[in-house]
């Protein structure tokens, strides 16, 4: 994570990045089997593009360890910002299967579809709550105000 954060902030000038731990979320399913994945996550913007850096912090089977084993560090997924049910229907109709799913602590569902054969990665769908949308807006505002140097890495609590 540290190497990726350095690259994105220093070289690309994306950021600042807001870093937080994601504990094991309820109801996680990986390829049809229950799992318990914990993550360290960093969100930052480059222009209007939201960049999510992920590091799994435990040794459970997941789409994250699957991709590391397959191709090492790098691109993992893109998230479509469309209504969750619409996305599930669209991707399922094209034959893509849910590889990983669960529920956020606030109740929003998420799913990562296996689109490896189509685009080399996964496609994520998520129900975004008003609180999550507001957090993303504050992150984007921080990006627009950022000087590209000071405090490139911040705690999620800094958004409050």
Q: Where do the protein language model's features map onto the residues?
A:
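Glyoxalase I/VOC metalloenzyme domain signal
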Residues: 1-18, 31-97, 114-160
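Generic detection of short hydrophobic beta-strand segments and adjacent strand-loop junctions
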Residues: 20-22
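Short, charge-patterned binding micro-sites
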Residues: 24-30
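Short Asp/Glu-rich motifs
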Residues: 28, 110-111
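Short acidic/glycine-enriched loop/turn segments that link adjacent beta-strands
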Residues: 105-109
């Amino acid at each position: 994570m540290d190497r990726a954060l350095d690259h994105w902030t220093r070289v690309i000038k994306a950021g600042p990045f807001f870093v937080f731990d994601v504990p094991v979320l309820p109801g996680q399913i990986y390829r049809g089997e229950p799992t318990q994945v914990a993550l360290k996550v960093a969100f930052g913007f480059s222009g209007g593009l939201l960049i999510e850096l992920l590091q799994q912090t435990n040794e459970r089977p997941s789409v994250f360890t699957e991709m590391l084993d397959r191709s090492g560090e790098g691109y993992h997924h893109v998230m479509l910002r469309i209504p969750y049910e619409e996305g599930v229907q669209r991707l399922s109709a094209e034959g893509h299967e849910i590889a990983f799913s669960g529920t956020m602590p606030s109740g929003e569902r998420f799913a990562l579809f296996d689109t490896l054969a189509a685009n080399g990665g996964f496609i994520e769908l998520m129900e975004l709550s008003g609180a999550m949308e507001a957090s993303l807006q504050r992150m984007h505002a921080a990006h627009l105000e950022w000087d590209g140097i000071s405090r490139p890495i911040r705690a999620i609590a800094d958004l409050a």
